Amino acid sequence: MQMMRWGMPSPAFVLKGKKTDKGVTNVRNTTSPHWRRWLGPAHRCVVPFTRFSEYQTIKGEKPKSVWFAPTGPQETLFFAGIWTNWTSVRKLKEGETTDNLFAFLTVEPNGVVAPIHPKAMPVILRSPEALAHWLDAPVEEALKLQRPFPDDGLKIVDGPG
């Protein structure tokens, strides 16, 4: 296991006129040339989690975090991710740094996440076979895992635990 900084390098068009690159935390369009270079096995990672949150926005109200957890007892799941070592300016006060950066792949939300966050949800892996497939399979095969997690695999919970 290795600590990394969340947020892959932003596409060049996003950075025009900016002094910093805050990074991209969620990658959905895996056909983009910007992301394709990091989709091979050497740049894939998994991120363990027991809970995650999405912001729920209701018109006229402050966004609030809604937490999701696996339905299995004490279950750890994994986000499918990509990573790279990159030199950039993330924050002006830090200046230029070289970091291992990562982001999650995302997909259309399942029936549990969609009412809260209709845009997307992370790609979630559960089985040892899915983990191995994501980490080692050829790109076209690995990307078949970029699909919504089954509705019965997640539940809404109170807080981060």
Regions inferred by a protein language model and the residue ranges of each:
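C-terminal accessory segment of soluble enzyme catalytic cores
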Residues: 97, 105-161
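A secondary-structure boundary/capping signal
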Residues: 48-49
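Cytochrome P450 core scaffold surrounding the K-helix E-X-X-R motif
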Residues: 17, 55-62
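A motif-centric signal for short, conserved binding hotspots located
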Residues: 68-89, 93-97, 102-106
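Short, catalytically relevant binding-site loops at active-site mouths
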Residues: 52-54, 75, 85-86, 131
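Short histidine-centered beta-strand/loop micro-motifs
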Residues: 35-38, 57-58, 93, 113-116
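Short, His- and charge-rich active-site/binding loops that engage polyanionic ligands
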Residues: 1-45, 69, 74, 80, ...
